[in-house]
């Protein structure tokens, strides 16, 4: 079963949310999953970067891959495949970048109105 975790640090605290996201994913492990991932946004002055780390298998592998990353906000996801292969391409989060803008999405299940959403977001 899929699970979603999100974290945002108060601006004045600038707390690293990566350990919070990983801990949240660990608490979801009992539900079962085949892949896990996280996307984080780091803010340095006016420069914002989004980084994505995805892994097939255990959250421990994701934790190892995310060592040293810091961020003030992020989302994380565990996936239990009902459609599509179990691989890093299908692991969440999904990121799309266009014209200097980024959007990061995690979801549970099938997005039935994906074409309508795509058209609205591209407008």
Residue ranges and their predicted role:
Residues 1-123:
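N-terminal glutamine amidotransferase
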């Amino acid at each position: 079963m899929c699970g979603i975790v999100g974290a945002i640090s108060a601006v004045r605290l600038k707390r690293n949310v990566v350990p919070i996201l990983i801990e949240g994913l660990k608490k979801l492990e009992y539900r079962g999953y085949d892949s896990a991932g996280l996307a984080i946004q780091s803010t340095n002055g006016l420069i914002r970067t989004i980084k994505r780390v995805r892994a097939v298998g255990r959250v421990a592998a994701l934790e190892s891959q995310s060592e040293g990353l810091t961020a003030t906000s992020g989302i994380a996801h565990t996936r239990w495949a009902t459609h599509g292969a179990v691989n890093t391409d299908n692991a969440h989060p999904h990121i799309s970048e266009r014209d200097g803008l980024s959007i990061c999405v995690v979801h549970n299940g099938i997005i039935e109105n994906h074409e309508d959403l795509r058209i609205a977001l591209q407008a």
